[in-house]
Amino acid sequence: FAEDIKPAYIHGYFMDMVLEEAASLLNVGLDDLYTGGYRIYTTMDKELQEYVEQLYAQEDLFPKSPVSGETSESALVVMDTDTGELVAVMGGRSYPEGQRSVLNRIEARRLPGSVIKPLVAYTPAVEMFDYTPVTFIDDSPLTVNGIPIRNADRETRGIVTMREALSKSYNIPAVKTFQEIGISTGVSFAEKLGIPFTEDDHYRPNLVLGGMEQGTTPLEIARAFASLGDRGSYKEETTIRRIDDSHGKTVYQNRISKEQVFSEETAFIINDILQTAADTGTAYRLKGLKLAAKTGTVQLPSLPEFDEVKGINDAWLAAYNPEYTVVVWMGFDRTSKENHLPSGSSGGGKYTTLIARELYEHIYDESELPNFQKPVGVSEVKLDKKALEEQKRVLLASALTPDEYVVTEYFKRGSEPTEQSDYWVVP
């Protein structure tokens, strides 16, 4: 009956994860853990955990269903980008005291929407297929298996660069890139970043838009984006640094082990594009914080009960820098025509980015946020913007290119353009 007398403790969601991890590491039951006199040293940043609990107590920071007026649920992961240590978590807006089993939403599977695009398409495209931020992708009408693929705004823009396609989260270029590199290639790549897929997922072109069979968890998304933030190296998350037994003997000591999954050059290029997303793209409410970020929105299911309903199912945000990776999910445990997120500007990107902004501003207060360091294997190149946008050519800026038409772009060393623009030469 020991589990029935689960002790009450503060920071419930975090402590549940600590106890679960400790029981697994020591191979003991929870009741033995409670009564065995162990001392567990956790990775929690107590001040930050208390802050996120206060943040999550503010109901106006979460969208309400436009039909029922119910406030949505949310999950939050704050991970140390470098070590994989969890420093603060929220598995819901509040912790339901006195219950034996509690739904921890950071471990609940949901469809990821566009937040998965960089993981299954663009990062492997840069790593394995020599894509650059100015690789041109055709954003023109596309039908896959008889289903039209549409951008969120239902517009198409013709030839766009990869930087624009990813930072603005266009759907058509994402599907085209995913098909170009091969669905299995993209899936295998993301598996190395800790995201599990089913056999069926290997055959889904819409996987790049979040159309997974079983979905993913906020924890898995945090791990994957922390790999981008940590220069291409993957590690498992943990809540525990050390465990001592009742005699003071250390019975477990965490040792961080990392695996280099892709190059730091690839990581830097994707991070730089996702900084554009945080400045002028889908996560623009994070502007000025030097963060890289990717939003994700999941549409309501294609079921008769939702035919007349305007709204969305899930809203995601992954934001990160070299020190902290933050993932926010918002939605309802059971989406219905009564309970769903509002669509439009009050939907996905707004509330998730507001939470992340509050969090990073609190962590860094008035101090400078760290930026991603450019690896030696990446060249900074000045391009001619007119040639890029009007001629759809990747050409170096010349001495004649006016300053306002010079754009800085990044290439892996050896793949830089060599031809100079003649756009400004008077005939």
What does each model-identified segment do?
Residues 4, 130-186, 234, 246-276:
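Conserved catalytic neighborhood of penicillin-recognizing serine enzymes
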Residues 148-150, 182-223:
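Mid-domain, small-residue-enriched loop/turn segments at the edges of structured enzyme/sensor domains
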Residues 52, 84, 106, 110-137, ...:
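Active-site SXXK
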Residues 1-43, 50, 191-192, 196-197, ...:
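Non-catalytic, structured segments within soluble enzyme domains
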Residues 16-24, 78-95, 128-130, 142, ...:
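Glycine-rich, acidic and aromatic/proline-enriched surface loops and short helix-turn segments
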Residues 2-9, 36-43, 102-111, 149-155, ...:
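Second-shell loop/turn segments in exported
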Residues 9, 31-37, 65-73, 178-180, ...:
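Short coil/turn segments at secondary-structure boundaries
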Residues 42-65, 76-80, 89, 96-108, ...:
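A penicillin-recognizing enzyme superfamily signal
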